[in-house]
Amino acid sequence: MRRILFFSLLLLAIAAEAQTARKFTINLTDDGAAQMVVFLPANPSGKAIVGVPGGGYSVLSNTHEGTQWSDWLNQQGIAYFVVNYRLPNGDRSIPISDVEKGIRIVRDSAALWHIHPHDVGIMGFSAGGHLSSVISTLSDFDVRPDFTILFYPVISMDERVSHKYSCINFLGEEGHKDPALVKKYSTQNAVKRHLTPPAIIIMASDDRLVPPVTNGVAYYSAMRNAGNECAMYIYPTGDHGFGCGPWFKYHDQMLSDLGNWLNNRKTPKADALRVACIGNSITDGHGIDMADQHGYPALLQQKLGNDYWVKNFGVSGRTLLNKGDMPYMNETAWRDALAFDPDIVVIKLGTNDSKPQNWQYKAEFKKDLQQMLTSLCPQLATPSKKKGKKARQALPTRPKIYLCTPIPAFKSSWNINEDVIANEIIPIQQEVAQEYGLEVIDLHTLFANDSDKVQDDGIHPNDKGVRRMADIIADAIKKQ
């Protein structure tokens, strides 16, 4: 009987090992002080996860919070990369740059390693969870992960409600006393609507080392308040640091929960046409709960289907005018939209520009619109129409840009001025569109009799309104 049991366990071990086709190590620094251990699956699904072990920014717990995850992840077809980052010793840029470099290598090597470059997640534990949340919220678009897995994460850098030594080791002896740095790197404060990737948070309720409520729960709350996709699993017991350890009472349930979350994540097709929705609160989804799933860009994704990949880059209150009170082109969302490298762009700006404090700079509206267009598509730097001549047929350009006129302002909420929109802003948009050979989607005319499709403020579309917007814009895109 013992012999049968021995051989059964041996076969299971061999089967698990067989799920990993290749294992090797890459130096992230010339001296090898930072390394990335690579586990490539035998049957790749295209998904990849970059692992970030914990250890309070003083050591690396890179077994049960690192390499031991390789068998289970490779069995799911997930490529796994453990970053053994350098410790900060007060210089937070050191571990940040190591993890960013790891993600960049994974994306740059995606074709070679059979990975979808936009299905690369990050998985961090404890202090490594904090580092993962920093990358997810504060890093540039090209190294920001597509999804985030946080195990019992340190989130707050306020040592009074967090893990004291993680705060000191990350920010430094002087830095952890600086309120501005504490606020910046307490990553619940850095969550951005639409831009921070979907997350799953896994903790035990009896964690005595990193308080769940002021850390993992705080990150979940920030994500939910922003309308971003986020799940949280809190198990009754387990304390801190269980990782992939089989001693964790809820180990099997945890793997099932995590596996289901990963399996339900939708990945864009590799050749999908990228659609960037640029705009103000109407694009952002003001007044639409969970706008990332129910705003007009999300509905546009549903209507266009899997051959398109739609992303929401809307930011509430923003102006096209660079001298406006909140210029769109100063935003992270604008930089992300450019880095997204879209095939199609839908621009829906102008409503906030009509406010008196902004429209005093109306002489610059055309120039700023031209700046936005030529930044998106440098080919447009030479307009398709010379002054005084008929517009000629525009040459094909990438991205294809659609200019949307603002929907009517049925009320003057926030000093938004319908007369300025109708008689000054829209004519400039139409003039520029003609000069550059762009298509105008005239939402202003199409919504003229649709006061029932806006919220009580008379400005923002309600659920019916965002569906109508998505229908109109999808029809325009599909005609091409």
Give names to the regions the model predicted.
Residues V182-K183, Q302, Y328-Q480:
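Alpha-helical cap/lid subdomain in secreted, periplasmic
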Residues G46-G54:
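Short beta-strand element of the alpha/beta-hydrolase
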Residues V37, R92, V217-P268, D456-I459, ...:
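C-terminal catalytic histidine-bearing segment of alpha/beta-hydrolase fold enzymes
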Residues K101-S166, V182, T187:
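Primarily recognizes the serine-hydrolase "nucleophile elbow" in alpha/beta-hydrolase
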Residues S61-T63, Q68, F81-P117, G245-Q253:
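Catalytic nucleophile-loop/oxyanion-hole region of alpha/beta-hydrolase
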Residues S162-K164, A272-A276, I282-Q370:
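Conserved SGNH/GDSL esterase-like catalytic core that processes O-acyl groups on lipids
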Residues R208-N215:
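Conserved alpha/beta-hydrolase "acid-adjacent" motif
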Residues I200-D207:
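Short beta-strand/loop motif that positions the catalytic acidic residue
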